[in-house]
């Protein structure tokens, strides 16, 4: 298979600086890595943070962003096992980890202190060819629609793991804050497939319609509601058993603790800049509310999340555009005008 020496990609040289769609070198895989011809990549809010550099974690520079890449294995290092040329592979947020620390031993690889992150500390999937650690790369079944599966590799895995973390049972109410965005639209579907009743909170044109089309039961528009907490408690007959916070609003997180029912779990997923999680201690203790963070997922979570997708139980509402339009996508993200998930075609 002929592999070019240069490729199209989007790269920036300083955080918040210009995004260049240009010819860049094709990387060479290390002994433990795959070289993947990326066909499509989802665009995540994390990519926006990586570009801006507004998280308390330094990015590499220059940087090619992206961490929801779906493509074909075209080369591999000498130490790679379990893969062959032509396999479909996914590039995840967790590109690689040490596999030797306590967290890796417990299958919490995303919490590895030496984790290598796609599109952050490792050049990611906003290019036509990208490398990924063979252990962490996702096995995508043959025949899978690569554009459709791309968002599952981060957004899908992340919300699926968050729902597991909430430890609910079938028939319980889950409230999803940010229910019509890229993460939320998948969370609604995974929640339905897992047997939960779904209440969504979001605001803006078309969001209730999207939420209901995905199987959501009760929708609250925060731009119109005068009492979100009261409305959630009333609709769920006492409060949500679990809350999945995927919005990037500190106020939404604070409210979610108030409408979570006794012995329920509030799961923090979205990462608003400089946000604090504020909870009234008396209320939290007396109601025995759990507040936990959930950070992407491990290899088993990835396999399970992909299985839901391959069985037709979840379907990312995507809009496919060319990689060259990435700056415009970031602008829409900043304005909160994204419904579902943007996916970029690396050939355009």
Swiss-Prot record:
Record carries keyword Zinc: yes
SMART domains attached to this UniProt entry: PKS_ER
Source species, domain of life: Eukaryota
PTM-bearing positions, type N-acetylserine: 2
GO terms for MF: alcohol dehydrogenase (NAD+) activity; zinc ion binding
Residues annotated as transmembrane: none
Reactions catalysed, as given in the entry: a primary alcohol + NAD(+) = an aldehyde + NADH + H(+); a secondary alcohol + NAD(+) = a ketone + NADH + H(+)
Gene3D superfamilies xref list: Medium-chain alcohol dehydrogenases, catalytic domain, NAD(P)-binding Rossmann-like Domain
Cofactor stoichiometry and binding remark: Binds 2 Zn(2+) ions per subunit.
Required cofactor names: Zn(2+)
Protein location: Cytoplasm
InterPro entries xrefs: ADH-like_C, ADH-like_N, ADH_Zn_CS, GroES-like_sf, NAD(P)-bd_dom_sf, PKS_ER
Record-linked PROSITE patterns: ADH_ZINC (PS00059)
Binding-site list for Zn(2+) 1: 44, 67, 154
Subunit (UniProt): Homotetramer.
PANTHER family, alphabetized: ALCOHOL DEHYDROGENASE 1-RELATED
This protein's name: Alcohol dehydrogenase 2
Protein species of origin: Kluyveromyces marxianus
Phylogenetic classification of the source organism: Eukaryota, Fungi, Dikarya, Ascomycota, Saccharomycotina
Gene this chain is encoded by: ADH2
